[in-house]
Amino acid sequence: MNEAAALAEVEIPAGAAEVLALAQSPQRFINREISWLHFNRRVLEEAENRNHPLLEQLRFLSISANNLDEFFMVRVAGLKEQVREGVQTPSPDGLTPSEQLATILASAAQLISDQQGRWLELRHDLAGVGIVLVDGVEVTAEDLVVLDRHFLNHVFPVLTPLAIDPAHPFPFIPNLGFSLALQLVRQADGRGMNALIRIPAKVERFIRLPDLGTGALRFITLEQMIGLFISRLFPGYAVKGQGVFRVVRDSDLEIEEEAEDLVRLFETALKQRRYGEVIRMEADAAMPAELRNFVARELGVNDDEIFVVGGVLALNEFSQLVSVDRPDLKFQAYNARFPERIRDHGGDCFLAIREKDILVHHPYESFDVVVQFLRQAARDPNVVAIKQTLYRTSSDSPIVKALAEAAEAGKSVTALVELKARFDEEANIRWARDLERAGVQVVFGFIELKTHGKLSMAVRREGAQLATYVHVGTGNYHPITARIYTDLSFFTADPVIAQDVARIFNFITGYATPGELDAMAVSPTGLKPRLLNHIADEIEFAKAGRPAAIWLKCNSLVDPEIIDALYEASAAGVQVDCIIRGICCLRPGIPGLSENIRVKSIVGRFLEHSRVYCFGAGHGLPSPNAVVYISSADLMPRNLDRRVETLCPITNPTVHEQVLDQIMVANLIDNQQSWRVLPDGSSERIVPAPGEEPFNAHQYFMTNPSLSGRGKSLKDSSPRSLFVRR
């Protein structure tokens, strides 16, 4: 049964028996892969949102294409492996791997077609404002002069024209690699041959052309330019047919749990990943069928793995065009605020944190405060020890530099570097070696568990005692992504939280199971039970006639046990509001099953990434008595059962109000970049009701200071209460 058929059978229950049947059926869940495709459809819809500047629409198109590539490299590759091994075990929603794969490929084909359709519209619109992508047949004589020089100086030296015959076998095409396939005829005797030109990844994709006196920004793609100079590469041959193709390979890593040297094991696995099986081939629609079939045979690709594209391949690379100097076609530049609370204390992070907990809301507030915290720790002679987790960071990481500086200054520095951070494995191996050379004690955590928690800890001698300052985050220690991801950075000197963080580090470095922590919770041992207990408490409050409410904000909601607990809560009368950016396997709004559950997704200028979990505790939401957590964990089995994740309570009244009444409420009432998730897993854009004011959460956060970071100078500019009880 395919997903469409499965969805068609999910009817609104007519009575108690039907509700019970659905509650016990696999169809109470939405397939996670299909839900992800719905999410990427929302991203593509933003490329069609005329409220965004044109180049921002192009950016969303690029993001949706890049997302789809990664989805194939990991999720589709995994399903293909299961099908190949004959796995018939259904997913929680009841679909076998082969059923999921068939549905995914059909949906992906439509998505790719729609991406290309949107590109054609954007191409026309961009040309109208002076950004023109020129086809090879449209180049002028003046263009050819420029291109000839560029080709000879910058492209020709790195190309290798390759005839395909027994002496010249079909070459290896790397993941996401471009190639130009050719059918050639020797002019001397009419003899035909197939040939290939691998298009180098390190050469710029879009070549600037003269403006021809129009002032326009004119470009041609690298593959189109190479096509103009085939005679330079194959003199004496005529082109009978040609076309560009691109491959996507299996890029998931398989790591043995028994390993003597984890770094060497990963280095070997990374080399093997480069040669992963081809799981998708994109071919230019202009490529003759005979030539396309030849390439497919050489790559070992089946018909259902070939996607014929009537447009431009690798739309993800249009992110390069977004960088052109046309600020009028982009979002207005935004400069993140630095928390005034830190400035009030002369830039002394420790003094500001010691006075009161601080929550920094990225990207609206600068990630520089996290860097400054670590730099101050590195340079403060009273700091004796620093501990840090690193999951992802930037190529020129100030975090790594601060840790190295601290170690070189003689401090005890421990860094947990997670080698299993997907697509950042090589960078993390490099960082680990750099840190070790500086004297940092580097550990790699668990082979079987991925350490995803975001923790930093500085131990400082103050008088006769040691004080511990900690940072608990929802996002990575990555200064670049911190400019576009919405995340939370919590700073505290609370000794209870500090002791919990120390025990979590001991768990990671020494396998010392932390047991029940005093305030925080950690997966895979205590985080999920903590959340389930809170859901159970809300159910009891509802049954007792007290206010009962749950607010969740995360990237994905997949875990069956959590979903079933939320269904039970809905049936008991608990009001559940979920802000889920991506995958949501829960079916909201079904009478008797989930009628009290609402799910929305926000897709906008910034990538929603923070995780927040709120429980009314018998007082409803929002309430100063509510239980509020921030977390590194999404509600997925991998996060809750197979990763080291953290759940941190927020008890400081100001920070509590900031998270609950400011951040969560703003996300809940957003009606400009929000989508309502429907029972079948699809979504519809939320628009203001008649008489309702438009409200954009991202714009609100850009223009309003946070409660805990605003400082004395902004004390009188507290944001108005946003909450309207529904």
From Swiss-Prot:
Residues annotated as binding ATP: N67, Y485, R581, H609
Statement: the UniProt record of this protein carries the keyword Metal-binding: yes
Keyword annotations from UniProtKB, A to Z: ATP-binding, Kinase, Magnesium, Metal-binding, Nucleotide-binding, Phosphoprotein, Transferase
Active-site residue numbers: H452
Recorded catalytic activity of this chain's protein: [phosphate](n) + ATP = [phosphate](n+1) + ADP
Keyword Zinc-finger carried by entry: no
EC number of this enzyme: 2.7.4.1
GO annotation, biological process: polyphosphate biosynthetic process
Entry-linked InterPro entries: PP_kinase (IPR003414), PP_kinase_C_1 (IPR041108), PP_kinase_middle (IPR024953), PP_kinase_middle_dom_sf (IPR036830), PPK_C_dom2 (IPR025200), PPK_N_dom (IPR025198), PPK_N_dom_sf (IPR036832)
Enzyme class, UniProt record, top EC level: transferase
Binding site for Mg(2+): R392, R422
Highest taxon listed in the record's lineage: Bacteria
Molecular function (Gene Ontology), one example: ATP binding
Cofactor: Mg(2+)
Gene Ontology CC entries for this record: polyphosphate kinase complex
Region of interest (Disordered), residue spans: 704-726
Matches recorded under CDD domains: PLDc_PaPPK1_C1_like, PLDc_PaPPK1_C2_like
PTM per Swiss-Prot/TrEMBL: An intermediate of this reaction is the autophosphorylated ppk in which a phosphate is covalently linked to a histidine residue through a N-P bond.
NCBIfam families attached to this UniProt entry: poly_P_kin (TIGR03705), PRK05443.1-1 (NF003917), PRK05443.1-2 (NF003918), PRK05443.1-4 (NF003919), PRK05443.2-2 (NF003921)
Family statement: Belongs to the polyphosphate kinase 1 (PPK1) family.
Role played: Catalyzes the reversible transfer of the terminal phosphate of ATP to form a long-chain polyphosphate (polyP).
Protein name per the record: Polyphosphate kinase
